């Protein structure tokens, strides 16, 4: 999401960095990453985002806003990549890749509390959604210069997204096709995959429900995400 020259990235699942590279995202302009919840298909590319922003001149640890436990995620990545940080620093030097800049700055988000940021006129409001058994999942309402966008995150249709989406300019809503999932179940080569494909249906919004949310919230432009299953089957 761009607000003036500043960029904010929402979720970084596997494959995100490839897309962002194709978009030629200017990493020095990226102010923060915001995580809706901590399923692997929403955080897997955080380490690559760290590397690209570090190499391209980030001047402080990468800010990551996320639910309770986001500090454990970033600490885990820092531990896993600690040798990598050291190797790159020793190879390229402090002027290029200072160790003081390596790592993350995790900040826990709270329900219905604005996220502080350094972009004039930008408001980012997290709100709780229902992705049980995920015990901390959020959507975001973003306002900038009179325009508003809501990002649902992964959720069932429990009313939260509709409440925050009333009359916004754009709704970005996750949705799954039950028909597609059922067809995938029919050809699943393993019983474990069949079970997973059955289970995921009870904590996502369907395409039909997402359309109803858009209609009832009076939002005409709606962008669907999560339509095809990621490799993690989440």
Which residue ranges define each predicted feature?
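Binuclear metal-dependent hydrolase catalytic cores
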Residues: 1-150, 156
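Loop/turn elements at helix/coil->beta-strand transitions in domains of secreted/extracellular proteins
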Residues: 6, 218-220
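Conserved acidic residues
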Residues: 31, 169, 220
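Short, conserved loop/helix-junction motifs that constitute active-site signature segments
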Residues: 56-58, 165, 214-218
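Active-site-proximal loop/helix segments of hydrolase catalytic cores
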Residues: 147-187
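A short acidic, glycine-rich active-site loop
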Residues: 193-205
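A short, acidic, amphipathic alpha-helical segment used as a generic capping/interface helix at domain edges
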Residues: 203-215
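Conserved small/polar residues in nucleotide/adenosyl-binding loops
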Residues: 225-231
């Amino acid at each position: 999401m761009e607000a003036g020259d500043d960029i904010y990235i929402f979720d970084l699942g596997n494959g995100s960095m490839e897309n962002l590279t194709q978009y030629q995202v200017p990493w020095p302009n990226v102010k923060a990453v915001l995580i809706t919840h901590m399923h692997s298909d929403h955080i897997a590319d955080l380490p690559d985002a760290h590397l690209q922003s570090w190499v391209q001149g980030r001047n402080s640890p990468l800010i990551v806003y996320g639910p309770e436990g986001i500090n454990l995620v970033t600490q885990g990545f820092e531990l896993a990549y600690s040798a990598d940080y050291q190797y790159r620093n020793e190879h390229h030097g402090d002027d290029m890749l200072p160790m003081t800049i390596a790592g993350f700055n995790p900040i826990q988000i709270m329900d219905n509390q604005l996220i502080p940021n350094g972009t004039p006129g930008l408001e980012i409001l997290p709100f709780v959604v229902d992705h049980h058994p995920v015990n901390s999942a959020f959507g975001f309402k973003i306002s900038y210069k009179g325009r508003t966008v809501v990002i649902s995150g992964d959720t069932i249709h429990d009313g939260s997204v509709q409440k925050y989406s009333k009359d916004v300019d754009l709704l970005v809503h996750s949705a799954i096709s039950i028909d597609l999932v059922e067809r995938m179940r029919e050809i699943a080569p393993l019983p474990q995959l069949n079970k997973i494909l059955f289970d995921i249906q009870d904590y996502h919004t369907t395409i039909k429900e997402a359309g109803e949310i858009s209609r009832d919230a009076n939002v005409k432009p709606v962008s669907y995400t999560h339509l095809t299953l990621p490799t993690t089957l989440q």
